[in-house]
Amino acid sequence: MGFGDFSTICTKAAIPLCALVGEQQINGGAGIQTNCYSRTIEIANTLIFQCANDFMHILAMVMTVIMIIHVRSKFTAVGRKEITSVFYIYLLLTIISLILDAGVTAPGSAPYPYFAAVQNGLVSALCTCLLINGFVGFQLYEDGTTLSVWLLRLCSLAMFVVSGAVSLLTFKNWAGLSSKNPIGIMIVTYIVNAIFLFVYVVSQIILVVGTLEDRWPLGDISFGVFFFVIGQVILYVFSDTICDNVQHYIDGLFFATICNLLAVMMVYKYWDSITREDLEFSVGVKQHNWEVKELLPDEDKRGTVYQDSDYTPSLYQQQYNGRHSHYSNLGH
């Protein structure tokens, strides 16, 4: 297997781009046959591919919407707008992956190469967005500002265009690129994205160790890396083995989708653990923090039996201690 050759990858994992790269031995067309596919089912005269994996995609969309709602509810948290972009891109990626895996656009159809190119572009955009989010915690620039938000959006869009264009040109054999030698896809989709993810993880470890007193966020990072790596290993190494041993009911894509979802959830958990709301400027949904601006004169106080009650020093008079601030330890 040479660099840029997808033969070994595609014979084990039924990823969408495998139907568009390489060369078939029978008719000389593009496409690499996978050793084992997950079962298809027929519903209302419609074939649905990768049923178990489709269910996980739907679950991933639901969980992503929940995470977006939780992030948006933290009105004053550091990096709220930036991290929300990560989940929006992941949501779009999950929708496109569901369309491809379920066979809504079947291999060989005219729209299939375009959807596969969009999928690769969204993968690159997601990794780029996550990379830039990694620098928000260092407060090199103010989060939530036009500079911060549009820097993230434009960089993510640029990588989406580059990766999507390279993929589409390769699939269509345009601009001198060939589907029989998809080295450009290997570089943009795998090598560059792997570097971005590595830099993100290292930067967050440096952030936690160098600036935060709490070490618990390292656990979130570790679990996120663990789930992601396990998912990739299962997909690209053991997918065909799993498929054969369970009589084609599931394959590596099913476990890879689960692990990717868990990794994204760890990204949310990590962000939530190192940020907090500024309670002075936020309004909680479930908490009602009342501030007494001016005390009433003694003659205006209403006489009540509760003034001399043993229950006067209630819990509501105790000072509220918010959770520890982590980003507040950093200087602006």
UniProtKB/Swiss-Prot annotation:
Membrane topology: Multi-pass membrane protein
Transmembrane segments annotated in the record for this chain: 51-71, 86-106, 121-141, 149-169, 182-202, 218-238, 248-268
Keyword Transmembrane helix found: yes
Intracellular or extracellular location(s): Endoplasmic reticulum membrane
Record has Membrane as a keyword: yes
The entry's keywords: Cell wall biogenesis/degradation, Endoplasmic reticulum, Membrane, Protein transport, Transmembrane, Transmembrane helix, Transport
Gene Ontology cellular-component terms listed: endoplasmic reticulum membrane
GO terms of molecular function: unfolded protein binding
Taxonomic superkingdom: Eukaryota
Subunit structure: Interacts with CHS3.
Protein's UniProt name: Chitin synthase export chaperone
